[in-house]
Amino acid sequence: AVVECNLEDGSSAQCYKFTVAYQPEGLEIGPFCPSNIDEKGGIWDWDGEKAGLYRLDRDFFEMLADQGYRFYDKDGRIVISDPGSGQPPEADHTCLMATPDKDVTITMLLPIEPRMAEKALSLGTVAKVGVALDGVPIFADAPSVLDTGHLPALDVCGGHIDPGGWYHWHATSTDIATVEKTEGVAVNCALAQDASAAFGFAFDGFPMFGSLEADGSKPEGLDKCHGHMGETRLGKTYHYHASTEFPNLPTCLSGVVAENNFSTTSSTGIGSQGNTRRGPGQAMPPGFEEAAQILGVSTEDLMNALKGNGQRPNIAAAAEKLGVTEKALRSALPQPPQHAR
């Protein structure tokens, strides 16, 4: 449907409003967490020592154990928890795997006529990126193991189930084969791969494509959001391109997004109307909402400030960005789970 909407720059516009199911019919998802270290699960973009994209297998979990993050018991069984259960994990380090809820629906808003913003919108942890052509929502990085102690496993196409019960992407899934080659990881996503195809639309209304132009050439003149103006199958327009490394999504949005552009019928998780139960792998790690309240900032601003470039957050830089002292920030933040080498 076409509806009147308000954009985040204060202007009025017309938006497409549409509702989708928890997961497209016929979409194959998984695997996520393996049941033991001898099985192969999904993938994870590790941002600690020896950072990179990995399959969730024995080599990966033993590497994490060597770094002090042990996700399996003495028999090699992976410790798995459901972040949508409302109960905190019973161990310091668990592989998170939510349960789908077939009754959940998702409603989104996209501007019909995209407008460039005066300043690009930075996309921090679990920020809303857009929606794929198959109707699956797209989000930025999932919370880091370094922040929460827990691992919200992605499947081999770069998606997983939100604690609210609905599936979403954390990657340009139709071009993840390019990432597979770049990262040297056997991903084997079952989705049809096309590096030049349209993947979806960002929440500012601009289209998102794979890592190549329609003619198979590499895109030129990309800005900091990995977008540019140029000819596409949709005509000449500003558009985004996937990167060749994981996560292969825009790091910021160049256009203006609609207010309240994402909601679900779930009682928990991102976009829920009554989100009173949060846990690792949800919109915010445990204790971060309380920290934001103590500091007098929004949870989104707090997570964006703490989001590093593949390593541990720079507390001093985050404090400066938030306009608080480093001591105040360290005091407010929850302590991560202890791990021993």
Model-identified regions with their sequence ranges:
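Long, compositionally biased interface segments
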Residues: 4, 219-282, 338-341
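Extracellular/lumenal glycan-associated surfaces
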Residues: 104-110, 132-136, 162-177, 233-247, ...
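Short loop/beta submotifs within extracellular cysteine-rich repeat domains
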Residues: 118, 138, 175-180, 208, ...
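Short helix-loop boundary/capping segments
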Residues: 146-154, 164-218
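Short, recurring structural edge motifs at helix starts
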Residues: 152-159, 221-229, 303-307
